[in-house]
Amino acid sequence: MSVDAFIAYLQLEKKYSPHTIKAYNKDITAFTSFCQDHHQLNGIWNVNYPLIRNWIVYLVEKKVSNRSINRKIASLKAYYRFLLKIGDIDTDPLANHKALKVEKKIQVPFSENEMWNVLNAIEYSKDFTGARDKLIIELLYTTGIRRAELLNLKVVDINFSTKTLKVLGKRNKERLLPIIEHLENTLQSYLNLRNSIKKVAAEEYLLLTNSGDKIYETLVYRVINKYLSMVSPKVKKSPHMLRHTFATHLLNKGADLNAVKELLGHSSLASTQVYTHSSIAKLKEVHATAHPRNKE
């Protein structure tokens, strides 16, 4: 069966982002190619688990990480659940599959000092590009929004009267985020220069390229890497790391976990609890001041 119906289902019913749908499609296409090349199968709707296990072994031999393999399997699981739902298959070949073990890495966020430096010590150019670049970093750090949410922000989402920013999150769920004074100033500076762009092709979108088009993913990564490399030796620099830093800094300052969950747009508290593992410095500080052995 063609995956077209599945892709439409992800778009229309599940409301997945284009980025997520692209990843699902890529994983299913790769598995389809494996079945054709190694097992002479023209479709993947009637495969069994031993064949899928062969694919997993093939990926392991190709040095694909367990984390990546689990993601690929998750794409297939979603596809087979869909086929089961619409009655195209009778059994799910991945129903009893257990995810491969993945070593949990504690990601260390950027420090408060690094974030202060990138937003205050660095001198951004006074033109449109400098204002936009600073706004990208300021938005990601002070609101904790996702990369896709950043790309899709619109001018009308900003309400200076209520000092709130409307964000359209996963599955089209809206949430309002506070606009703090620093962010408000950066927004105003950017908007003043934004109006000077000769050609505004994507007028409704907040963040634009120098030619007036909607910004794209690679540009965001380039901006983050450029400026954070000036203040931090960390290798990994990404929109998600700034989101991670946002959550960790809030929790370090005693923010309520449920409040952070709402700010991040998480549907479950379990997703937010991941960030509590990063508050090592705060835990050490509490331990040092509270434990009797540290007072002897």
Q: What annotation goes with each model-predicted range?
A:
Residues 1-296:
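Conserved catalytic core of the tyrosine transesterase superfamily
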